């Protein structure tokens, strides 16, 4: 974050084909896999492809939302911690899915109910739980 602006909030595609499986190796414990920021010899990284930039203000603005000032109810909060993928079930577009990205309010509310009683967050903060839903096409895997 820089002020109220998130610098990185993205969904990326990761291809593990050809990547080194470090499970049950020395790298699966205390041995660093990238000492000094360089992968150890013989270790091949997974491939990362940028897919969706949640911070895209042009798209957020279409729905009255934004990334950055003013820090109001329509500014996306900082932590987006949930993701789900649901098939669109569209026979004409079988690779289409709904990507649901969400964040909770971390109990920062003025109208909460927990453990059998009402509460108000001490700082006065009142954050909404929010879900963003995208219809996406997942690219076919290369053979």
Model-derived regions, located:
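Sequence/structural signature of beta-propeller domains
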Residues: 1-143
């Amino acid at each position: 974050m820089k002020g109220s602006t998130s610098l990185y909030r993205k969904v990326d595609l990761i291809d593990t084909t050809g990547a080194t499986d470090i499970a049950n190796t020395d790298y699966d414990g205390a041995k660093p896999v990238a000492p000094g920021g360089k992968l150890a010899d013989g270790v091949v990284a997974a491939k990362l492809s940028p897919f969706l930039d949640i911070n895209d203000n042009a798209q957020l603005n279409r729905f009255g939302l934004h990334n950055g000032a003013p820090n109001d109810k329509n500014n996306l909060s900082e932590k987006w911690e949930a993701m789900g993928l649901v098939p669109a079930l569209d026979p004409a577009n079988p690779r289409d899915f709904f990507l649901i990205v969400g964040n909770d309010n971390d109990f920062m509310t003025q109208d909460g109910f927990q453990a059998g009683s009402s509460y108000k967050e001490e700082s006065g903060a009142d954050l909404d739980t929010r879900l963003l839903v995208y219809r996406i096409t997942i690219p076919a895997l290369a053979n």
